[in-house]
Amino acid sequence: MQTENNEKPLLGADNNALVALLAVNLVGYVILGLIKVVYYLESLPLEQYAAQIFQPLTLSSKWISSPWSLLTYNWVHDGFWILSGNMIWLSIFSYTLQEKGANKHLFPIYFYAGILGAISYIIIGSNQPLFGAGVSVTAIVVASLALIPNHKLLSNLAGGIPVWILGVVFLLLQGYFLLDANMATDIATICGGLAGFVYVMLLKKGKDFGKWMHQLLHLLNNSLAPKN
């Protein structure tokens, strides 16, 4: 007799990768905002907040003193509109990948893009810190363009909008904003997009470099998920 599997997914839904990505970015922004408010209420200078809390989470030329910034920089934001823009684009293109069954690849693409972007940023070097989800979001966009360029969103609206059109809009906007950025940030963003492209190309050849992450999540789900 078969036993029913009463385990629930860790975040409560099978297609939770996008929810998880959004949650980490949004919760991180709220937590940093609350800490900033505490500094303000305690009449502490915001420069102190930046030096003690925010800057150690961003990637800078002094990354060796805060090596964790290699993993945290692409999860932190300091502006509501920048955060909103990144999360909207992340949602649009992650959703298209989810529709094509690539949900489990969202986090690996986000992760590898962040690492490759960080390495390239360190190699080029810059006096300005790197932070925000832009590098990883670019990877998700490029991955969507490489995998499903003709997939249509809002199909009930005049036949739908092809992914490639939205991708071109994103890349044009990204290119415009990068005009004011330093070379290290430009290269990091390009490398992030390259990570998304290479990941998809390898996936098409049957090479899943996110497999170890899938296995880790499965292990965590079995260990921590609530059971009925």
Regions found by a protein language model. Give the residues of each.
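Membrane-interface micro-motifs in multi-pass membrane enzymes
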Residues: N127-P149, V163
